[in-house]
Amino acid sequence: MKLHELKAAEGSRRVRNRVGRGAATGNGKTSGRGQKGQKARSGGKLRPGFEGGQLPLFRRLPKRGFTNINRKEYAIVNLDQLNKFEDGTEVTPALLVESGVVKNEKSGIKVLGNGSLDKKLTVKAHKFSASAAEAIDAKGGAHEVI
């Protein structure tokens, strides 16, 4: 088989439908747009959520909740990610960013207890879950809230 003998799979290529080219084509005159009306005109699109003038669903439902402007988002680090460091290392937020464990610090670092810790480490972070703090201390390491 040569390159010029390759054929596209049956039905994978559709012929472009040219509209407005005479009544005999089946797509002449109104070009598949039906008769008059907003959708027959050029640029005649309806905005998302428009229900023909009926009060739309998003306006019928009540507003709910609010966005807390003081919300802090913490970068999450799990225990199994800390195994990357050598025994006895002091793990700081700067070291976590530098080593690529977290992309950026955000509002701080929070250490969670997923996985298991195999090394003795001194971990400095902004928050610790109870299980994470317990696991770090159990391995002979230390956790320090900064």
Curated annotation (Swiss-Prot):
InterPro entries: Ribosomal_uL15 (IPR030878), Ribosomal_uL15/eL18 (IPR021131), Ribosomal_uL15/eL18_sf (IPR036227), Ribosomal_uL15_bac-type (IPR005749), Ribosomal_uL15_CS (IPR001196). The gene is rplO. HAMAP family: Ribosomal_uL15. Belongs to the universal ribosomal protein uL15 family. Residues 1-13 have a biased composition (Basic and acidic residues). GO terms for cellular component: cytosolic large ribosomal subunit. Residues 23-35 have a biased composition (Gly residues). Residues 1-56 are annotated as: Disordered. SUPFAM superfamilies: Ribosomal proteins L15p and L18e. NCBIfam families: rplO_bact. Pfam families: Ribosomal_L27A. Part of the 50S ribosomal subunit. The keyword RNA-binding applies. It comes from the Bacteria. One of its GO terms (biological process) is translation. Binds to the 23S rRNA. One of its GO terms (molecular function) is rRNA binding. Keywords: Ribonucleoprotein, Ribosomal protein, RNA-binding, rRNA-binding. This is Large ribosomal subunit protein uL15.
